[in-house]
UniProtKB/Swiss-Prot annotation:
Its EC number is 6.3.4.2. PROSITE patterns: GATASE_TYPE_1. ATP binds at S14, I15, G16, K17, G18, I19, D71. Belongs to the CTP synthase family. Residues 292-535 form the Glutamine amidotransferase type-1 domain. It comes from Lactiplantibacillus plantarum (strain ATCC BAA-793 / NCIMB 8826 / WCFS1). Homotetramer. Pathway: Pyrimidine metabolism; CTP biosynthesis via de novo pathway; CTP from UDP: step 2/2. This is CTP synthase.
């Protein structure tokens, strides 16, 4: 029978529940168990696809085209699995589906209520995550903190799961903060005690506590927490601040986190072989070089807005024994007058995805600088589109060239709306989303980046595409269309082969990068940038 692990949080948000859940998932997977993981977000949006990155951070896209919370990126990178639409569920999605059933008459005239209809829908999503993947273990993280009014239906559903499945088949983990008061030189357990008290008031007794802390907790403190919160002392897991998040699975393994869970489930499994992870973590802590990458984007003020890009750069750097010094530059600040000052010390320039016209000219200026000065360049999604526009303006001489998204009246719409998007009215969930095949042209930089594979599957999130009526003119000036859809209609990758590295993709390669298996384009980009990387002092 499938076993279910529920991860909740208390005291403060952004406490690291997702990393804890992903770390446990990796340990259980390495013990030979099939694991899947999901995130419930209490907000009323159906998905994060229409939310500002400043509000929510990055939108992560799964193979099946679901726009999800950025925590799913952590899940995939840590556990090395591909997730699906059941891996991210919001209050908005639950209510939308319940209301659709009510309109169809599925409830046979019953009064539709939070209990049982909403809670049953939540439980169905939990069960589906396991049945659709045939998993041994389902890990479910609840966003926000216990006590938030928005999360109450989810907490109630988790409580009911124990009655539905039996206590031997569910395991509750509660993550909390132990604040350190520098003035007093003390760590305080009271917030954790109150958070657990709140959780217990909703009918859930946690089996394990994960306490986030700046300082190591003492045995006395561990026993105190265990006594007041009614858990075993060994089930109080310390989560210290670390230099790299890839230390966390090893840290919690040392505290027998995975074994405690399996003992509760009465599941026998060999000890997790984490030798590859140990090597990775040691390598990450001892990198000998530094590569400076300039990321020119729209949402640089928020760290999480480009989290998958940041992690993909790091993964590629690890294989080159290089730490990535990421210099985030607001595209709005880049002008022809200051571009040398802003980008002159960069070993590579990356322009990521985005939407809208704000900062567009700054991105084009940065791309022009990379092309004219032969600085390794990687463009992603909008970055690829603007690389095409820059080439049209400054190489083909089409001075008013633009994207129809930015300037609908441009005489040279190098980037145009996709035909199947013309009658689309809703914004949410209507883009070209998910994994699609990209056919690579043999002998190109892109093909070599993927070890000369003929076709690669990559994830997309866009409405606009390269306008094929400009393909011939650009090719005549040296641009190579090295990746296309299998029918050759949609341009997926462009490159300038005479440059050290100048490649841009319509798809989002960052979503498939793994810490021990960097994505091809990122690896090739960092390899090129590494030629000017600096040895660490």
């Amino acid at each position: 029978m499938t076993k279910y692990i529920f991860v909740t949080g208390g005291v403060v948000s952004s406490i690291g529940k997702g990393i804890v859940a992903a770390s446990l998932g990796r340990l259980l997977k390495n013990r030979g168990l099939k694991v899947t993981i999901q995130k419930f977000d209490p907000y009323i949006n159906v998905d994060p696809g229409t939310m500002s990155p400043y509000q929510h951070g990055e939108v992560f896209v799964t193979d099946d085209g679901t726009e999800t919370d950025l925590d799913l990126g952590h899940y995939e990178r840590f556990i090395d699995i591909n997730l699906n639409k059941y891996s991210n569920v919001t209050t908005g999605k639950i209510y939308s589906e319940v209301l659709q059933k009510e309109r169809r008459g599925d409830y046979l005239g019953a009064t539709v209520q939070v209990i049982p209809h909403i809670t049953n829908a939540i439980k169905e999503k939990i069960m589906r995550a396991g049945t659709t993947t045939d998993s041994d273990i389902v890990i479910t993280e609840i966003g926000g903190t216990v006590g938030d009014i928005e999360s109450l239906p989810f907490i109630e559903a988790l409580r009911q799961m124990k009655s539905d499945l039996g206590s031997d088949n569910v395991f509750y983990i509660h993550t909390t903060l132990i604040p350190y008061l520098r003035a007093a030189g003390e760590m305080k357990t009271k917030p954790t005690q109150h958070s657990v008290k709140e959780l217990r008031s909703y009918g859930i007794q946690p089996n394990m506590l994960v306490v986030r802390t700046e300082q190591p907790i003492t045995r006395e403190m561990r026993n105190k927490i265990a006594s007041f919160c009614d858990v075993e002392p060994e089930a109080v897991i310390e989560s210290l601040d670390v230099k790299t998040i890839y230390s966390i699975p090893l840290n919690v393994q040392k505290q027998n986190m995975d074994q405690i869970v399996l003992d509760h489930f009465d599941v026998q499994a060999p000890k997790a072989d984490m030798s590859e992870w140990i090597d990775l973590e040691h390598h990450v802590q001892n990198l000998s070089r530094t590569i400076k990458i300039a990321l020119v984007g729209k949402y640089v003020a928020l760290q999480d807005a480009y989290i998958s890009v940041t992690e993909a750069l790091k993964h590629a750097g690890y294989t080159d024994d290089a730490d990535i010094d990421l210099k985030k530059i607001s595209a709005e600040d880049v002008t022809p007058e200051n571009v040398e000052e802003l980008l002159g010390d960069a070993d590579g320039i990356l322009v990521p995805g985005g939407f809208g016209d704000r900062g567009i000219e700054g991105k084009i200026t940065a791309i022009k600088y990379a092309r004219e000065n032969d600085v390794p360049f990687l463009g992603i999604c909008l970055g690829m589109q603007m690389a095409s526009v820059e080439f049209a303006r400054n190489v083909l001489g089409l001075k008013d060239a633009n994207s129809a998204e930015i300037d609908p009246k441009t005489p040279d719409n190098i980037i145009d709306l996709m035909a199947d998007q013309e009658d689309v009215e809703d914004m949410g969930g209507t883009q070209r989303l998910g994994a699609y095949p990209c056919k690579l042209k043999p002998g190109t930089v892109a093909a070599k980046a993927y070890h000369n594979e003929e076709v690669v599957m990559e994830r997309h999130r866009h409405r606009y595409e390269f306008n094929n009526k400009y393909r011939e003119a650009m090719a005549a000036k040296g641009m190579v269309f090295s990746g296309t859809s299998p029918d050759n209609r949609l341009v997926e990758v462009i490159e300038l082969p005479k440059k050290r590295f100048f490649v841009a993709s319509q798809y989002h390669p960052e979503f498939l990068s793994r810490p021990n298996r960097p994505e091809g384009l990122f690896k090739a980009f960092i390899d090129a940038a590494n030629q000017t990387g600096k040895v660490k002092a």
